[in-house]
Structure formats: structure tokens, C-alpha cells
């Protein structure tokens, strides 16, 4: 149990997808203007990561890994295309659910919801799972931990950006300039967790 807690904390804080690896920055910067929308996208990314990492773990271990189907047959060259296909299918299902049951969130996310399919944070989580050779239970913990970490980062940035609307920001830094500075400072803050040994 201690191993899973360590893996979860490492995925959320130490190896944060947005602030340690800078993955998923296009949606991270574009949707972080409003806390509610950022939280909704964070939930969507968490759900997709939490489901796609274990699903791709099964596909990788049962089909793609060297010798998984037949001894001596290595289908690992199909990793990228297969992982993206599984992610795309899961995002389409999530999009249909949001459109049906949460239309306001679906409309607020707009084009960024289908872009979760090609969000490099999602693909990064799946790739790290394969590289680090996580088993199925570790991939569940890592997927949800990575999603929670990404959601934490985008909600923190959105809340800071909402407060900065009332700040006296220099003209040259207004908009994305101050957002990049803020993101960099947040990344420095999260770097302090890198010394933690779990």
C-alpha cells in the first residue's frame, strides 16, 4: 500500500505533467482563464488519464509487448498508433457523456474537449506507463495521480489569473506574458518537491 501512495504523490507533485514535464500546455494556458472551466477540463483530463493509462496498459501487456500474443512476435512498433486510438475512443465517449448530461460544461470547453485526444499530457502519461513498465494496479494509480496533478496545476493557475485581473500588471506582460511568468514560478514551487524521496 505504501508503494501506491508513494506513486500517487510522485505523480501529483514531483512528476506533475504540467509543471515538471510541461505537457499539455496548449490547453493548460488557453482554458485557465476561469476556475470553473479549468476545473471542468481538469476533471475531463483526470477521467481520460485515469481510464486510458490502465486501458493502454492492458493493450500493451496483452497484445503489443514482445511475446504477448505469440512467442517471438514483437508488436511494440504499434505502440503510438494503438495508444492514440484508445485515447481517441475514450475521449469520444467522454465527449458524448458531457454533451448529454453536462451541456454547459461541454459548451464552455468548446474545441478543447476534442483536443484532449491529442493532448500530450494524456499521451505522456500512457508513454511513461509503458516506459516504466507499470503493472495494471500501478497504472491505475499513476493515471489518476497524473490527472489529479494536472487538474491541480490548471486550477491553481486559473485562480491566480482570476486574481491578476485586478492587479496592476505592466503593459508588456499583460495576457500570456504574465501567465508564462506565473507558470514558471509555479513550476519552481513544484520543483521543491523533487528532493522528496518516496
From Swiss-Prot:
* Subunit field text: Composed of six subunits; NqrA, NqrB, NqrC, NqrD, NqrE and NqrF.
Quote one Gene Ontology molecular function term: oxidoreductase activity, acting on NAD(P)H, quinone or similar compound as acceptor
Q: What class of enzyme is it?
A: translocase
An individual GO BP term = sodium ion transport
Keywords from the UniProt entry: Cell inner membrane, Cell membrane, Ion transport, Membrane, NAD, Sodium, Sodium transport, Translocase, Transmembrane, Transmembrane helix, Transport, Ubiquinone
Query: Where is this chain's protein located in or outside the cell?
Result: Cell inner membrane
* Pfam families named among the record's database cross-references: Rnf-Nqr (PF02508)
The name under which this protein is listed is Na(+)-translocating NADH-quinone reductase subunit E
Topology with respect to the bilayer? Multi-pass membrane protein
Gene name per UniProt = nqrE
Query: Which reaction(s) does its UniProt entry say it catalyses?
Result: a ubiquinone + n Na(+)(in) + NADH + H(+) = a ubiquinol + n Na(+)(out) + NAD(+)
